Amino acid sequence: MAFGISESCYRYQAKLSSENAEIADWLVKLTEDETDWGFGLCYDYLRNVEGFQWNHKRVYRIYCELALNLRIRPRRRLKRHKPEPLKEPIKPNQVWSVDFMHDQLSHGRKIRLFNIIDDFKREGLVIDAGYSFPAIRVIRSLNQLIEWRGKPSVIRCDNGPEFISHEFTHWAKQYGIRIEYIQPGKPQQNAYIERHNKTIRYSWLSKNLFDTLEEVQEHATTWLWFYNHKRPHKANGGKPPLAVA
């Protein structure tokens, strides 16, 4: 007795094969472009940014077949007490978190990055690159941001000299902005910006050698757009900050 396979079954198999190739192409491209991304970010990007509805298990199977799961070696995590979770804002401009990062150019000159995020949806607002950031420079960056976005109710920061200076506290008082200082030695109290800093470090800052401050600023501005519009974020259910209603 002979058994035949219908034409529709052949078409279905061909479609599966074609889709699998497309999935593989996307995964290879994403992991080449974003070398710090694991499967979770890749899948969230494909589903929430590109709009593909591919099954999670199917995409992961192809991810493993390509040996992409062997790229990133898991870091050994230290056991530590869970910090008290920060209160989630319910609207934009309720709380901004600010902080500095340090790095250096190819010839050794030290630079700083002044980072600002809106805690609501973790939107990246500013990455300002400079050689030094006295209080007056910090105020200038904030004023430029407030001009187009409006002022926050609260700014959360550490006890760095720029933030406890008379100039900064006087400026905040004039605007009616409350400064929420974290306790010394407890960066987890500013966890949102600390996590943002880590993402900046691993996504591009530690991967590139820059010759000039202008190169750093250009790269930072380009990446910030990508972060807000394209990069999935766990806090937003795997969606980029500006893709969340």
Question: How does the language model describe each region?
Answer:
Residues M1-A245:
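Charged DNA-binding/catalytic regions of mobile-element recombinases
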